């Protein structure tokens, strides 16, 4: 049997795996247990009452968190003409068409988000094998294929998170950093849950948001009592 590290022993002693924690208590616990030598992210896992094997029950989208994620996001935009100037003015680091595609083919991937105007998809489509596996392929459902590229750039910079359920029907994303205030983390989590509820598939039956857990990068998950969250029904 593998020997538990001192950190894991402390976590096991502090976190009750059978308990639903009030959101403020959960955040306080995460902060207490965050002892890594870097500022850890606060991640969330949301178990949804969907059948991920059915395409009409998959949940995918994006939402801007009110307090951002604490990450600096580099944005690449495929567009041209006036849209290119607007994207640059909005803060995009990389803007282009075929020239940008050639950079990516050459292995230059110094960006976190890719946005494209509809007329640029003929170029972006040829990069599917490169961008797809990295989760960077633009998609209308996440607002990254849009005629208004400037707004999409601003959203990405403001702390937009993209979400998509995995094969087990679970959404994984980040809601901030452990040095955020409890109010900031609570409001970010509430914004995410509200967005997920709005994205509920019409055919999904029964309890939709089944479980919500938050954790730090190096920590264990803490289950949240959803009654302590202020979210849309």
UniProtKB/Swiss-Prot annotation:
SUPFAM superfamilies: Ribosomal protein L1 (SSF56808). This is Large ribosomal subunit protein uL1. It comes from the Bacteria. The gene is rplA. Part of the 50S ribosomal subunit. Disulfide bonds: none annotated. One of its GO terms (biological process) is regulation of translation. HAMAP family: Ribosomal_uL1_B (MF_01318_B). It comes from Shewanella sp. (strain ANA-3). Binds directly to 23S rRNA. The L1 stalk is quite mobile in the ribosome, and is involved in E site tRNA release. Belongs to the universal ribosomal protein uL1 family. InterPro entries: Ribosom_uL1_bac-type, Ribosomal_uL1, Ribosomal_uL1-like, Ribosomal_uL1/biogenesis, Ribosomal_uL1_3-a/b-sand, Ribosomal_uL1_CS. CDD domains: Ribosomal_L1. It holds the Pfam family Ribosomal_L1. Keywords: Repressor, Ribonucleoprotein, Ribosomal protein, RNA-binding, rRNA-binding, Translation regulation, tRNA-binding. PROSITE patterns: RIBOSOMAL_L1 (PS01199). One of its GO terms (cellular component) is cytosolic large ribosomal subunit. GO terms for molecular function: rRNA binding; structural constituent of ribosome; tRNA binding. Signal peptide: none annotated. Coiled coil: none annotated. PANTHER family: 54S RIBOSOMAL PROTEIN L1, MITOCHONDRIAL, LARGE RIBOSOMAL SUBUNIT PROTEIN UL1M.
